[in-house]
Curated annotation (Swiss-Prot):
Family the UniProt entry places it in: Belongs to the nepoviruses RNA2 polyprotein family.
GO cellular component, as recorded: host cell plasmodesma; viral capsid
Name recorded for this polypeptide: RNA2 polyprotein
Keywords for the protein's UniProt record, in alphabetical order: Capsid protein, Host cell junction, Repeat, Transport, Viral movement protein, Virion
Domain of life per record: Viruses
Regions crossing the membrane: none
Length: 1882
């Protein structure tokens, strides 16, 4: 027997036995037992039926059982199984009819392939054994055979089979449905992509098409205008009609889009015109955007609109935003419409009856105004349509369309507009027919307010009926053509008691049956809000009368008030909106409003920006609620303050007016406002005149749907909101236009308001209205009233009454922040005292004490900084201050100041030891402003500023003709010549022969002073010994022209100082007596930060005028232990020439001080040595007996220095001049009984000894003017040897006074130069020396990381082709330094800062990192931080040879192509007014031109390390404005990488070099740079600590620390850890930063204290740091898992990344790979070591390893080195490689053709377990061009450099991944992906 199943061509049957078994075991049929196709089965019986005694098959039909051949046409089944064997049976399993009929071909595991789906089914035949196993109950028992006992009944087994098959069928159906959905979504995505491409193409073509269209339109328009007469201008009515038609069409289109999904579907009127065709569907785009917004995890903003208001709710999800907005809208509309609609229904009939009785005419309302719409809502149409909850006002001509509920408006979520919700609703029918109307209305405040409002509306429309109509039949109104009618009072019935109570002039008794109502229209203003009990009657004057009193205003403004509601001070402005009459019973206290309206659940935080008149008797208007919330940032907790305590100091004087506030949500006592950004602005208060006393007037002309319309088309009702946002599906957005999804607005809010049609302004509305009337109805008072009405409307600002009034109005507040112009404004009534207070506070903050100058002098830049402002007393009263300002000419604005004395600077007595400073004279200096001060530029290039005065302040002698040159004169080379021993001997011999008196006379004659003065000077060193005071002047007066008087700032900003710049403890190295013991250290007198700041000021040289050495020994008086200190200039190899001075003393003499005057002049290059070796201090002792390890003395050294400009002229004070004269004879001063020695003589006598090298060790030496002699070179050394001398205790005459107060020797001036100091400009030729001039524009609100400008040095210099570039072009290569000079606007308050970064090797790639330049990347590159406070001129000098590694070629780059990036570091703390600009120059400084490549190595191995450079920035770091600021700590991980973005990280070359070392000890040097606003100040304390040690401010004072009193400056701290060292790769050390003063900021300034930290270097103590290994051998890569036996590989000998498709490559990361990747190029020699291991037992194994080195490829290949090794044996091979190309250097980038290549081959490679490639660096290996490492992402992810997946192998370390050779890897990988090996042969 066989069975055949048909299903409309799709056959459902089991193809084989195995399929049947799977169907039984896998449950591959559905729950109801259907095969997936739901087929119709037909059966054909091919064998006679069995005997009747056989058991019937379950599920068979009667026809089958009877043996009928006819098919079962109506039987639907899923499975038909034919079982062969005795007896043959078939199983028919019927399915349910009409369920899931699928027409598609069958799919799934049981589906038949399409090629096998034929018209005949496949027979499934089972043997008897199989049938017995599968379904034993189907077999009929045979004769003579015992039937097997069935474990279950047939029905039970059939049910089990059915259940198992149903589960699999259901799974198949689900897979089919899932496939349909996938196809559908794919089609949607494809359509979306096509639409996006079309939109992009349309956007690209739009400008061109628009230009063509505009041009064609202009041509046609000009031709038509020339040919035709000008058409008449359209009337206002026509314009209004056109606007109305456009608005109606838009409304119809919007409503039509959602009609199919409306919950309420009333019957449509088929007589309506057909709607416009639907726009193309863009459902997929909108659905995707909506789903993306719904799935956002952060809080989102949702907006909705109400009449003239907008709202923005912030909720965790979009669903919460929609629900909150719809709930508020529904409540608002219900509350408003309840009173208004009910009141309108009452007043409609009453007013019309009154019209008929009084005027005899019927009143027609103007369609489109508020009254007609409200009354239309309350008409019969509302009653007829209440069943469908639709409120509509029928138009006159067109029938009314159905209106969708609010849920459909919610579906149009992205397009909510103002006009969508400006309709009225009546939610339910309410009975208003009550017995006691007055009592009920009093109880219902909302109904009372609505009646009051509509009453005013109707009364005004009475007058409007006579006077104001739409322009239909314009008739000019005759002036005063009618008179007032006699019927001015009309009787009314008793039912209108409420109107009589409030609208009639006199109060009548309560029970009077009738009263009169005045016929003339009168409007009642806001009532007094203080009335509480019962409404009072206010007698209002007529329109022609003047108001004698002021009425309190009524305020309406957005205020969503919750418990944690915040107010934004920054955007508050006052806007008075027209408001209805506020009844007394509608006023309530602020804190008790709307408690019952608090929404359920947690309340979100809001931020509010709106006017807030906060006064003591502030009231809230319960009547009309308008909701609007502006989008605002998150309010921080420290920016909040209580509501009632806001602006307490800004309350006006006098009684406070009553206000009425309109708000929809509750107020509570915990109401908070935003303290941080609040700024109150109040409109000018003026008296309200009678013409303006009509708050209801603007409502009469305000349209309801944001446009004026003659006939209202519809007034849709707002029904219930959607239950959930999940109801919104894809079909909701099918009919929306494409333009709805593409716009150029910054946010959705702007896009919403851009679609709102603008309302007609008052002027436009008045222009469209004309006056019309008749002789009977027009009254004289009406004409007067209308004139005043037009005047009243035209006087308003038009933006106040448009649909965007809240956003477009520009409020003009009275209160403004003060703007200080830098001078006193005599017209200011308050004297502008705040300006002086402000400037004095700034001066105090920046340490700028005030100074006044004489107007008759000419001042330089230094004097300009010392200008003092006149301080006007603050306790003189307002009148006195105003009088002094207004009477400026009569003011006594003089200051008594002590100018320079006109005598000798110092007069001292030989016997009394009293120094007489001389008499002082007080001079009257008139008050001047800064504009009167002038600066003397001097000669071109002069950077020295000498003060010109009327008379010399210091008595100076006539020019001396003899040979003299004292420190302080303008001769730069006076002390440059070396001291010769012969000249010194002659000078000493003359000194010994002459008497002391002769020496004094000679000294006096030489310097032009008296004998007494010379004797006092000569004896000055001995007189200073008992007091132990320094003879040096105060450091603040050393370089000033004043020797006495006020304290002033020093020249050139940097204050010279002789404070103890460095103090060391002298610890003996030998404990035994008689052995010499010494101790030495190096000292740099000027820091890197000081030099950088002085370079910006144009200085280039340092003059070391005085060196002060102090020895404070450890011991008792009388101790004869000798101590000797010698100071050398260690940059001179000859000690005789390098000696600055030496001093010897005894421990028993106590404190010893010596001041030397070396006159040493150094360029900044001399001070920028890598190890800081400028001065060397040697301390020794010959007879010390102190225990070993304890300090013998404390030695301090300090300098008195001055920075010089190119002119080398300088000015010193008289005190310093006298000090130099005191030490002239012996060239040093002594104290404490010390013996000092210094090079003698101020002038070198004799003949310079010229020396010409002749070779062979012979020199030609000049012996006289014309005499020369030939001799061998000889050298001599100057040795200071100490010896013990008996110095008893008799010389000790008492206690030693060790005070240092007043000396100025070790005083720190305590202030840095102000950041806004002006800088003296150079000569006019300076601009011509620039190689490039550029300009940069910065946006006023630029954010951190914004890339402002990029300077390609070679390209841009080539483009401008200036004089310098032409010189560069002639020579070829540029070497040396470049200086970038920026002219920036000086501003210390904005807090704006920038970074200038040099990228020489293209490490920044916009395709990888985006358009913004990461600040972290700039912090690792060579970078200078620039703040606007550093202006106006900022310079940055960098060495091209060191940073680029080679000289720059003039036309294009070689290995380096340097670019300078200008980027924003920190945002503006104080907002800028407009965009700004600055210019810069690129200058060549200390440069040379040559034709040499001139490579300068960054590091050469091996290297002698005296210091370890770090060279990176960290920050920006902020300190909060609080009384207890938390300390900031930097983790000092010098060797680890920095994460730049995402999983991309990098490190610079200095950090890569530190990877070679484990760690070190020493001293950490760095500096702090302030980048924030000057309004925030702070003093910092820095200290190093171990990570496990807790450090507080108290404990930091007790350990090594550094205090930056000004919040910035250089620092140096010793590394202090338990092991006296720190690790470069472990988190071990912290730099803790404490705020010890501040942060302090004035009011309204919320900017935190911001700074950057630069880590410069570590000064080593023990020399070479601890390396990571003894032999610098590194494993470059490893090969494993070879896929073929004959394995070959080749790569260029340049240490690249290696990729191979025939094996697995494991790249290693180590210091060598990082250093190669972080530098530009390298050169040197190395040995490649190949090592391999086997994965099998060595026996008869064959195979070999061969490696060779060849130069070039292919035919031109040159064989060099080759080696062959068997696989079994040493398992190692070595090949020496030289990393060079034709340039002498190489990179890890793309290979070339002619360069060394390494060829490696393995036979029987599968036997090799691993092949390792090691590299051993040889001596002389050099790296060039320090930069940062290439960017790569993690292994297995898309590479940021390659654009494809990285090779598997190089592991990440902590935060770093990737390896060297990114460019080579890119080229190699691209070639291998294309199917070829670029380095293979053939």
């Amino acid at each position: 027997m066989s069975s055949i199943c048909f299903a409309g061509g799709n056959h459902a049957r089991l193809p084989s036995k195995a399929a049947y078994y799977r169907a039984i075991s896998d449950r591959e049929l559905d729950r109801e037992g259907r095969f997936p196709c739901g087929c119709l089965a037909q059966y054909t019986v091919q064998a006679p039926p069995p005997a009747k005694t056989q058991e019937k098959a379950v599920g068979r039909s009667a026809d089958l059982q009877k043996g009928n051949v006819a098919p079962l046409k109506k039987q639907r089944c899923d499975v038909v199984v034919a079982v062969s064997g005795p007896p043959p049976l078939e199983l028919v399993y019927p399915a349910r009819v009409g369920q899931h009929r699928l027409d598609q071909p069958s799919k799934g595991p049981l589906a038949v392939p399409s090629a096998k789906q034929t018209s005949t089914a496949m027979e499934v035949v089972l043997s008897a054994e199989e049938a017995a196993i599968t379904a034993p109950w189907l077999l009929r028992p045979c004769k003579g055979e015992a039937p097997p006992p069935p474990p279950l009944t047939q029905r039970q087994q059939f049910a089990a089979l059915k259940k198992r098959l149903a589960v699999k069928g259901q799974q198949i159906i689900r897979e089919h449905i899932r496939a349909r959905k996938a196809a559908k979504y794919a089609a949607i995505a494809k359509a979306k992509k096509a639409a996006a491409l079309a939109a992009v193409k349309a956007a690209q073509e739009a400008p061109r098409l628009a230009a063509q269209k505009a041009a064609i339109s202009k041509i046609l328009r000009d031709r038509d205008v020339a040919a035709l007469p000008p058409p008449p201008p359209p009337s206002a009515a026509r314009l209004a009609a056109e606007a109305e038609l456009a608005s109606k069409a838009e409304s119809l289109r919007r409503l039509k889009a959602f009609k199919t999904f409306s919950r309420v579907r009333p019957a449509l009127n088929t007589s309506f015109p057909p709607p416009p065709p639907p726009p193309p569907a863009r459902s997929s785009e909108l659905l995707a955007a909506f789903e993306a917004a719904m799935n956002r995890s952060q809080p989102v903003q949702g907006g909705f609109s109400l009449p003239t208001r907008k709202g923005v709710y912030v909720a965790p999800t979009v669903q919460g935003v929609v629900r909150a907005g719809l709930r508020a809208q529904k409540g608002f509309l219900n509350a408003v419409s309840t009173g208004i609609v009910a009141g309108a229904r009452i007043l409609k009939s009453k007013s019309q009856n009154w019209f008929r009785r009084s005027m005899g005419i019927a009143h027609d309302y103007v369609e489109g105004c508020m009254a007609s719409t409200v009354l239309g809502c309350a008409g019969p149409v509302v009653q007829r349509q209440e069943a469908c909850s639709v409120v509509a006002a029928p138009p006159i001509v067109e029938p009314v369309l159905w209106v969708p509920p609010l849920s459909e408006y919610a579906n149009d979520f992205p397009k909510l507009t103002c006009s969508t919700f400006t309709e009225w609703q009546r939610p339910r029918k309410q009975s208003i027919a009550i017995s006691n109307l007055f009592r009920k209305l009093i109880d219902r405040a909302l109904l009372v307010s609505g009646v009051s409002l509509i009453a005013s509306v109707l009364l005004f429309e009475i007058a409007e009926n006579f006077a104001v109509r739409q322009a239909v039949c314009p008739v000019e109104m005759p002036s005063c053509a009618t008179s007032v009618s006699e019927k001015s009072l009309v009787s009314l019935d008793e039912g209108n008691f409420y109107l009589r109570k409030y609208l009639s002039p006199p109060p009548y008794p309560f029970g009077r049956e009738s009263f009169y109502f005045q016929a003339r229209p009168r409007f009642i203003g806001p009532m007094p809000s203080m009335v509480r009990a019962v409404p009072q009657i206010v007698q209002q004057p007529t329109m022609t009368e003047e108001l004698e009193f002021e009425v309190p205003s009524s305020w309406s403004s957005p205020l969503p008030l919750f418990a944690n509601f915040k107010v934004n001070r920054g955007a508050c402005f006052l806007q008075v909106l027209p408001q209805r009459v506020v009844l007394p019973d509608e006023c309530m206290d602020l804190l008790s409003l709307f408690e019952d309206q608090l929404p359920e659940g947690p309340l979100p935080s809001f931020s509010w920006s709106s006017p807030l008149p906060l006064f003591a008797n502030f009231k809230v208007n319960r009547g009309a609620c308008f909701l609007q919330v502006l989008p605002q940032r998150v309010v921080l907790p420290d920016e909040c303050m209580d509501l009632l305590s806001l602006f307490e100091d800004q309350l006006p004087e006098g009684p406070l007016p009553s206000f009425s506030w309109s708000s929809p949500l509750p107020l509570f006592a915990s109401f908070k406002v935003n303290r941080g950004a609040c700024f109150l602005q109040v409109l000018p208060a003026r008296k309200v005149v009678s013409d303006e006393f009509m708050d209801v007037l603007p409502f009469l002309f305000s349209p309801l749907v944001s446009h004026q319309e003659e006939e209202p088309e519809m007034v849709p009702a707002v029904l219930e909101a959607a239950d959930s946002v999940g109801d919104i599906t894809e079909a909701f957005f099918d009919d929306l236009e494409c333009e709805s999804f593409y716009d150029s607005y910054s946010d959705e809010e702007e896009a919403e308001w851009a679609e709102v049609p603008r309302c007609k302004t008052m002027s436009e509305l008045c222009a469209s209205l004309t006056l019309a009337g008749d002789a009977e109805g027009l009254r004289k008072s009406h004409g007067v009233f209308l004139k005043r009405l037009v005047t009243y409307l035209q006087s308003f600002e038009e933006p106040l009454y448009s649909s965007r009034a809240f956003y477009s109005v520009k409020v003009k507040p009275v209160y403004r922040p003060k703007k200080f112009e830098g001078h006193i404004d005599c017209t200011c009534l308050d004297g502008n005292m705040g300006e002086w207070e402000w400037r004095e506070s700034v001066d105090a903050m920046w340490r700028c004490p005030g100074r006044l100058l004489n107007t008759k002098r000419t001042f330089t830049r230094d004097d300009w900084e010392r200008v003092q402002y006149l301080r006007i007393g603050f306790n003189e009263g307002r009148y006195r201050r105003n009088w002094r300002v207004l009477n400026l000419e009569e003011m006594d604005l003089s200051l008594h100041e002590y100018p320079e004395i006109s005598s000798a600077p110092v007069q001292s007595s030989l016997f009394s030891r009293v120094v007489d400073r001389g008499a002082t004279l007080a001079s009257s200096i008139p008050f001047v402003t800064r504009s009167n001060c002038q600066s003397s530029l001097g000669t071109p290039g002069l950077n020295v500023h000498t003060i010109h005065q009327e008379a010399p302040t210091t008595l100076r002698a006539p020019p001396f003709t003899g040979a003299r040159n004292v420190m302080g004169s303008s001769d730069a080379g006076a002390n440059a010549a070396p001291y010769r021993s012969e000249a010194r001997k002659r000078w000493l011999s003359r000194k010994q022969e002459d008497s002391q008196e002769d020496n004094i006379k000679r000294y006096a004659d030489k310097h032009g002073i008296s004998f007494e003065e010379a004797r006092a000077v000569y004896k000055a060193p001995k007189e200073g010994v008992p007091t132990q005071r320094s003879i040096l002047p105060d450091v603040r007066d050393a370089y000033s022209a004043r020797s006495a008087g006020a304290r002033v700032r020093s020249l050139f900003g940097g204050s010279p100082t002789t404070r103890a710049q460095r103090t060391e403890d002298f610890v003996l190295t030998s404990p035994s007596a008689g052995d010499a013991s010494s101790f030495s250290f190096y000292f740099n007198p000027v820091s890197e930060q000081e030099m950088a700041e002085q370079e910006r000021g144009g200085n280039t040289m340092l003059s070391l005028d005085a060196v002060e050495v102090v020895i404070d020994p450890v011991g008792m008086p009388g101790d004869d232990t000798d101590l000797t200190v010698m100071v050398l200039w260690c940059q001179n190899s000859d000690d005789q020439r390098a000696l600055i001075g030496a001093m010897s003393t005894f421990v028993g003499n106590g404190l010893a001080r010596a001041v030397f005057y070396p006159g040493l002049k150094l360029l900044y290059a001399n001070c920028r040595v890598r190890d800081g070796r400028v001065l060397k201090v040697i301390v020794s002792s010959t007879n010390s007996t102190l225990t070993h390890g304890l300090p013998q003395a404390q030695v301090s050294i300090g300098t008195l220095r001055q920075h010089l400009g190119p002119g080398h002229d300088r000015t010193i004070s008289g005190a310093l001049y006298a000090s130099q004269q005191q030490g002239f004879n012996i060239r040093a001063t002594e104290q404490g009984g010390a013996v000092t020695f210094a090079p003698q003589g101020g002038h070198v006598e004799g003949i310079p000894s010229a020396n010409v090298q002749m070779g062979a060790g012979e020199h030609l030496i000049q012996a006289g003017p014309m005499q020369w002699r030939l001799q061998r070179s000889q050298s001599s050394r100057f040795v200071v040897s100490g010896h013990s001398r008996t110095r008893g205790s008799s010389l000790f005459t008492g206690s030693v006074d060790r005070t240092q107060q007043g000396t100025g020797a070790f005083e720190d001036p305590g202030f840095l130069p102000p950041r806004n100091s002006s800088v003296q400009g150079g000569s006019w030729q300076e601009g011509t020396e620039a190689a490039y001039l550029g300009k940069v524009t910065c946006a006023k609100d630029a954010k951190g990381g914004t890339l402002l400008h990029t300077l390609d040095i070679i390209k841009e210099c080539k483009s401008q082709n200036l004089l310098r570039y032409k010189e560069w072009q002639r020579q070829g290569f540029l070497h040396g330094k470049l200086r970038l000079r920026c002219f920036i606007p000086t501003n210390i308050f904005c807090g704006h800062s920038m970074m200038c970064s040099l990228d020489a090797f293209g490490r920044y790639d916009s395709n990888v990192l985006g358009a913004s330049f990461p600040v972290k990347l700039a912090s690792l590159l060579p970078t200078e931080v620039i703040s606007l406070a550093d202006g106006p001129v900022v310079t940055w000098t960098f060495d091209i040879g060191r940073l680029c590694g080679h000289g720059l070629y003039y036309s294009e780059g070689a290995y380096a192509r340097p670019k300078i990036y200008f980027l924003v570091l920190s945002d503006n703390d104080v907002p800028a007014e407009a965009d700004w600009q600055f210019t810069y120059q690129l200058l060549f400084e200390d440069h040379t031109f040559s034709n040499s490549f001139g490579a300068v190595p960054f590091i050469t191995l091996p290297h002698i390390f005296n210091r370890l450079d770090i060279g990176y920035w960290r920050g920006p770091t902020e300190i909060d404005l609080t009384s207890t600021p938390a300390p900031n700590a930097y983790r000092l991980l010098f060797g680890l990488s920095t994460v730049i973005s995402g999983n991309m990280s990098t490190l610079n070359a200095n950090q890569a070099l530190l990877r070679f070392f484990q760690g070190s000890n020493g001293t950490l040097h760095g500096r702090i740079k302030k980048i924030g606003t000057a309004l925030t100040t702070c003093s910092l304390l820095l200290s190093l600590r171990h990570k496990d040690a807790s450090l507080t401010l108290e404990t930091a004072y007790q350990r090594p620390h550094y205090i930056l009193a000004d919040g910035q400056g250089a620092f140096s701290l010793p590394i202090s850890t338990p092991h006296a060292a720190t690790s470069f790769l472990e988190d071990m050390l912290r730099l803790e930063i404490f705020a010890i003063a501040g942060p302090f900021s004035p009011k309204d300034n919320k900017a935190k204290y911001q700074f950057m930290c630069y880590f410069d270097h570590i000064e080593l103590v023990e020399g070479v740091p601890r390396t990571i290994a003894g032999e610098q051998q590194f494993n470059w890569c490893s090969f494993r898992n070879f896929k073929i036996d004959d394995w070959k590989f080749e790569w260029p000998a340049r240490l690249p990344d290696i990729l191979d498709d025939k094996s697995e490559v494991l790249l290693r990361q180590h210091p060598l790979s990082l250093l190669i990747s972080s530098t530009g190029f390298f050169t040197g020699r190395a040995i490649f070591v190949f090592q391999w291991g086997l994965n099998t037992t060595a026996g008869n194994m064959k195979g070999s390893f061969s490696a060779r080195l060849a130069f070039g490829k292919g035919v031109e290949e040159i064989e060099q080195t080759s080696t062959v090794q068997p696989l079994v044996g040493a398992c190692e091979a070595r090949i020496p490689v030289e990393f060079k190309t034709y340039t002498g250097y190489t990179t890890s980038g793309p290979p070339g053709s002619m360069e060394p290549y390494i060829y490696v081959r393995l036979t029987q490679a599968k036997l090799v377990d691993r092949l390792s490639v090691n590299v051993i660096l040889q001596e002389g290996f050099s790296f060039y061009g320090p930069s940062v490492k290439h960017f790569k992402k993690e292994v297995g992810t898309p590479s940021a450099t390659l654009g494809t997946n990285n090779p598997v192998g190089r592991p990440p370390e902590n935060v770093d991944t990737g390896g060297p050779g990114g460019q080579y890897a890119a080229a190699l990988q691209a070639a291998q992906q294309a199917g070829k090996n670029p380095f293979g042969r053939g």
